[in-house]
């Protein structure tokens, strides 16, 4: 497994792979890898000849400096996991390599609408940072496919739109959420939970499933469903942050013509902001 930290070396390897006619898959990550990331890697391996995993804690997508400072950097452990998975290439650049003149004056990519709604409304600049780094990685790696987790539902929708709008010839693969046995969605942020909070955390998925059950039996008073769900989260020990029921195909409000809904939930548990989602077919 090659570990590359500089743009010239990465370009050299990508040129070689292209000359050999290899099909390349990219898995962009911020490191601190868990089994959910490994599922992305496995999906990439099944679809391509060569798998490139990027590990870069992107300062442009953090709206709070303290979040950036405390985000775990576990490069050695991450590379050991990826080596066991027989990943071909890890791209682990420094911030200086990606943003030589800092983030403030760096050219950015913005996806109107999707970047400022829902999660974007409560985290200004976050999705602009995501779309900028992902488009830069697409330019550098030139993958045939790229794999992203469905846990970050809005992020996946944003990347699909960016790819369509910018004409990237890249297949975007959404990989289903991986969960612990008790239902908690795997996330790097779960590491912020205390042992006691970890026992409470599966309650998020229980509330999510409860909302889904109501929608599936035909309940359509969305405001009431959301209010009750917020109360349930708070009673379980969470601090409900945002609960949305949206059209899964547009992320706009659910309408009479909506075929599928997505339930998006964000809640604080101690110092961890947990997010999850669930799709529901609307009868």
Swiss-Prot record:
Beta-alanine binds at residue 61. GO terms for molecular function: ATP binding; pantoate-beta-alanine ligase activity. One of its GO terms (cellular component) is cytosol. The keyword Secreted does not apply. It catalyses: (R)-pantoate + beta-alanine + ATP = (R)-pantothenate + AMP + diphosphate + H(+). It is found in: Cytoplasm. InterPro entries: Cyt_trans-like, Pantoate_ligase, Pantoate_ligase_C, Rossmann-like_a/b/a_fold. (R)-pantoate binds at residues 61, 155. Its main location: cytoplasm. It comes from the Bacteria. Homodimer. Belongs to the pantothenate synthetase family. This is Pantothenate synthetase. The gene is panC.
């Amino acid at each position: 497994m090659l570990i590359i930290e500089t743009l010239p070396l990465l370009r050299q390897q990508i040129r070689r792979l292209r000359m050999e006619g290899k099909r390349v898959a990219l898995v962009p990550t911020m490191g601190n890898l868990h089994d959910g990331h490994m599922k992305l890697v496995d999906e990439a391996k099944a679809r391509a000849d060569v798998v490139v995993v990027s590990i870069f804690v992107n300062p442009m997508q953090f709206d709070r400096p303290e979040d950036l400072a405390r985000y775990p950097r576990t490069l050695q452990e991450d590379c050991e996991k990826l080596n066991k998975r027989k990943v071909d290439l890890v791209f682990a650049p420094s911030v200086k390599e990606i943003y030589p003149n800092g983030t403030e004056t760096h050219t950015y990519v913005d996806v109107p609408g999707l970047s400022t709604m829902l999660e974007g409304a409560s985290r200004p600049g976050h999705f602009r940072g995501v779309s900028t780094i992902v488009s830069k990685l697409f330019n550098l790696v030139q993958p045939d496919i790229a794999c992203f987790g469905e846990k970050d539902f809005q992020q996946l929708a944003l990347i699909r739109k960016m790819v369509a709008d910018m004409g990237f010839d890249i297949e975007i693969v959404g990989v289903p959420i991986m969960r612990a046995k008790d239902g908690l969605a795997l996330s790097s942020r779960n590491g912020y939970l205390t042992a006691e909070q970890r026992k409470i955390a599966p309650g998020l998925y229980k509330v999510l499933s409860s909302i889904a059950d109501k929608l599936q039996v035909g309940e359509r008073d969305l405001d009431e469903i959301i209010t009750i769900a917020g109360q349930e989260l708070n009673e379980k020990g969470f601090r409900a942050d945002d609960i949305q029921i949206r059209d899964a195909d547009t992320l706009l409000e659910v309408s009479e013509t909506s075929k599928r809904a997505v339930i998006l939930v964000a809640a604080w548990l101690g110092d961890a902001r947990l997010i999850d989602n669930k799709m529901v077919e609307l009868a």
